[in-house]
Design a protein with these regions (language model features):
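Residues at beta-strand starts and edge strands
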Residues: 1, 35, 53-57
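Short beta-strand-to-loop capping motifs
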Residues: 4-10, 61-65
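Amphipathic alpha-helical segments
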Residues: 6-24
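Short, surface-exposed beta-strand/loop "edge" segments at domain boundaries and coil↔beta transitions
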Residues: 13-15, 37-41, 63-72
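Short Gly/Thr-rich strand-loop-strand
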Residues: 27-33
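A short, structured beta-strand/loop element
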Residues: 33-52
Length: 82
């Protein structure tokens, strides 16, 4: 399964999220592994929203559907519960 999303968080926060997961391994500062899942992070230009410029990162998760969905669920719990 491949899941690509644009997260409205700075690259540093996305990296901190993956580094904070005990069972996620860091290959490079923008590539992580979780079981069968490979995670690639790409920094995007900020989205212009009037006077605000929201920082964004493209997150691409590829691997077994169960692993991709579990990691995505963790992200939702972390960032949507704030």
């Amino acid at each position: 399964m491949i899941k690509e999303e644009i997260w409205r968080v700075p690259l540093q926060r996305a990296v901190a999220f993956f580094r904070g997961q005990e069972d996620v391994m860091e290959e490079t500062t923008r590539v992580f592994r979780f079981r069968s899942c490979r995670i690639d992070l790409s920094e995007l230009k900020p989205a212009s929203m009037g006077i605000w410029a929201a920082k964004r990162v493209k997150v691409r998760m590829e691997g077994d559907e169960v692993d991709v969905e579990e990691l995505h669920h963790r992200f939702l719990l972390q960032f949507l519960s704030m």
